[in-house]
Amino acid sequence: MINGETKIYGIIGNPVKHSLSPIMHNALFKKFGINAIYVPFEVKKDLKNAINGVKALDIQGVNVTMPYKEEVIKFLDELSEDSQNIGSVNTVVNLEGKLVGYTTDGIGARRALERFTQVDGANILILGAGGAGKAIAYELSKVANVVVLNRTIEKAKRLEKFGIVGDSLEALPYYVEWADILINATSVGMNEEKSLVPKNLLRPGLVVMDIVYKPLNTLLLRYAQEKGCIAIDGLWMLVYQGAESFRLWTGEEGDVELMRRVALAWLRERK
């Protein structure tokens, strides 16, 4: 029951009405008996005032999603080492008025992959060098060989200081053959029938993960299934990164099975 002691959390982005994060986090608050609520904040412009509002209203923490994962940094008081290194934030913790930025995208992707396959020492190809792509590449480069392809090659090349190879999307056929794991870290496929990877480049046994979760079964994942690949939908990464955000805010380990279950139920209701 909402009362004067209820703590507020949320997600900032544009758009965020589609977000599954409120469904998952509110289920966790209920499970752990935490007097808190998680709501979407659609910020069409003026991110600075929105972040100032987090402080002014004593909002305990927010997730940050597209298009603000990089822009939000200049309005925060402190960054985790990972966020500092890659220039991306998706989780903000309000520590008594001090806003600290973290990134949980990378650990979310890594844990999702580890659920299905061996990650240590693998050859991993990531498409996209935006906020999520950078975070995923940085985290996975700690234990694997990582290549990032991007339309703007300069953005991919900036990751080379972490031992990551950056190249153009035009090199896709060569690197797909090299890869054990392929990750789409772009928004291509979100609410559209598009795939950056043609079906003929895929092969049996290749692990294919898409960070897009609307639709859950993207065109890329359908291609992967048809070619005998191991297909991992974007909801797995979402629940694992959400569980890590929940831990940063509350100190509790998020229940990924519960998070996925309530998210799937919500998606089914809206088909």
UniProtKB/Swiss-Prot annotation:
UniProt-listed Pfam families: SDH_C, Shikimate_DH, Shikimate_dh_N
EC number: 1.1.1.25
Catalytic site positions: K69 (proton acceptor)
Subunit structure as annotated in this protein's UniProt entry: Homodimer.
Record-level Gene Ontology MF annotations: NADP binding; shikimate 3-dehydrogenase (NADP+) activity
Stretches of the chain forming a coiled coil according to its record: none
Protein name: Shikimate dehydrogenase (NADP(+))
GO BP annotations listed: amino acid biosynthetic process; aromatic amino acid family biosynthetic process; chorismate biosynthetic process; shikimate metabolic process
Catalysed conversion reaction: shikimate + NADP(+) = 3-dehydroshikimate + NADPH + H(+)
Family: Belongs to the shikimate dehydrogenase family.
